Amino acid sequence: MDAHIANETKHLLVHGNSKTRALVHIIVPDACLKKAGVDPVKLSDRHRASPSAAPVFRVFAQTRYHATGECSLWRTVFAGYVPSGAIVSALVPTVPADHPRLFQSTPDSGGLFVSLEIECDADGRFDAFTLVALRVDIADDPRTTEVLFTYDELLPPGTRYGADSKRVALLCRQFVAYVNSHPTVSQSAVTAASHIEAAVAEDVKSASGPQVSYGARIDPAEYLFSGGGFDNHQALARLEDDDKEIMSLIRRASEVIAKRNPVRVLSNPEVNGDAHRRQCVASGLRQGARGAHASDSHARVGFNSSIHDATALLLGLEPPDSGRFVNSGPQRHLPPQGPRSPASRDCQSGMLDDVLLLTPENSNPLTPLDWLDVGHAAVAGGDTPRDVWRRRPISLVARKHYGTCETFVVVSYENSTAWGGRRARDEHLAGSINPPVMQACVAAGVDHPRNLPPETRGELIAKFPMLTVPLGDTPPPVAAFDAAAELALIDHFRGACVSALLKAISERLRAEPRMSQLIEYDIPNNNRDCIISVAQRAPELLEAVALAIQNVTVTEFCNSALMLSALSHLNILSGNKRGRLPYHRSWLPSLAGGADAFLFDYYSSGGEVVKVSPVPLAILVTATRTGQHSCRFARGAPDSSSKTYERYLPGECYAYICVGLNRSFEALVVLPGGFACRASAARKLAWPAHLVEPILERYCWTIPSH
């Protein structure tokens, strides 16, 4: 939950109350992370062999606009991973170590807390097909993984605060039960528990509160999948009216008190030659608020500003420990006040830290939740923003993730300004622009918005300018009104790169079937039989490798030498003033190697030929005086913790066939023993010019031109 609060704070600092920017808080459970390719175990410090100051993982987000191919820059977002009981951690306030059974709950799985930015028009309307890409970079995992969320997935039809009423009541009951069974807790907690118990008993008597039994546990699945549907707008309106009525009663009561005991205006004699006219400080303000003084009074020689400030403040106040706002009563329910000023407690400046109360000292908070605030802070030894949010109504909405078919959770808090929060401005994310488009399709009898008549499309574009590209006359760069458009784009890129590589290798072998020992190795006589076996199996091995490359999945492709080299090649061709570098960590060693730096994917040569390297290995291939080439690791010699394939250079081990590419998209296929062939895949890469920028923006860092 701290990640949600941090992201919301950052969002408000950057965008303020912008009408075109919003935020949505989500929890991504372990099941969804696993299906997306993120290993939840590696998101926790527990799997590390030794502690490290470096973060376990970092999360980046990018907005990808509907059908345009355009993207925002990658931006870092705060994220937090809870290994166990992720949803429970949002529903249950902090349980102190010395009070481990304060609140009882049923733990759920782990989950990732993160917040995603939503862009909309000035009326709060958003495009449901715009999506947010979430990238998780794990320190101990060189692979990169993206999780895609469309706005339609992220923004439910409504909130479910009503389903949370039972949890709030159960928190109160559990607190009362714990305090009543533990006499050692502070008196403030006992007082709070007694008031909560009285209020809950009154609710039960009037049957106005949710019916919960003592001993029940807070179960996140119960609130997530049962307890009612979306909040009824009429019911929410009634709640708001009730709140307004309560505040009206409080205001009227304060006016009555003020009429009975009007605030005095005092004119006191001159002090140090200056006339002072002071009003009483409003009740509830700290007495330490500075009074207005004569501007020259501080400059006087021998002037004691501390005593003078106290005198000036207290002149207009009622005497301490007496007056119409204070009477004798039990111990104050507020938390203990902070340390006094350095001055003596007996002098007037020591009174500056006192707090004036609007009502008598034994006056109660308005609701059981107010008392829960006081009691929980007393038991926990203090309060935190996250506990304030936990002790108030929370909306949990289960959503189905399109890419993984798993559930994730959209969270809204009463004290939040993000989507669904009760502190959000009016007309905050008012709705999607797509229902009017669908209605137009039904009226026109077409099955796709781009098949609408030109005049209808023009009307929709005039009403919603963000539909200019999806509904324009020119076919959009990326498929419009298709939730799978992003997957189709990267699969298209995968197909183009695979085709270019295989065509280049095939053309090279047809022109020159013989493969010489391009990589220099000394082969002992006792390995002669292995070399003969490899030579005899070479056609079958190459065919099997080609088949493995052709069947590579999108996830494997995004972590392959093939994709990273293709991105570098496209960046050179684009001629863009803003340089781009593939954000994959495996590409970093290639920055200093130039054309000699190759990224190699390793494939097994025994039995079934499969890709064994989850990420490519950076190898420097340099020419020697003999006309052959030598290889060395770009990152230095591997250590004992390296995987088996990482300990061998291309061609050095008979168990692997290696396929490498450099930044010029030149391929090098190396068989055991160093027998290899080179081919230019760049000449065979056919990628549309209008899709160069979209693919680079998605998978590269952008380097500013200045």
Swiss-Prot record:
This is Capsid vertex component 1. Pfam families: Herpes_UL17 (PF04559). InterPro entries: UL17-like (IPR007640). The keyword S-adenosyl-L-methionine does not apply. Interacts (via C-terminus) with capsid vertex component 2/CVC2. It is found in: Virion; Host nucleus. It comes from Equine herpesvirus 1 (strain Ab4p). Keywords: Capsid protein, Host nucleus, Late protein, Viral genome packaging, Viral release from host cell, Virion. Belongs to the herpesviridae CVC1 protein family. Its main location: virion. The keyword Glycosyltransferase does not apply. The lineage of its organism: Viruses, Duplodnaviria, Heunggongvirae, Peploviricota, Herviviricetes. Signal peptide: none annotated. GO terms for cellular component: host cell nucleus; viral capsid. The gene is CVC1. Capsid vertex-specific component that plays a role during viral DNA encapsidation, assuring correct genome cleavage and presumably stabilizing capsids that contain full-length viral genomes.
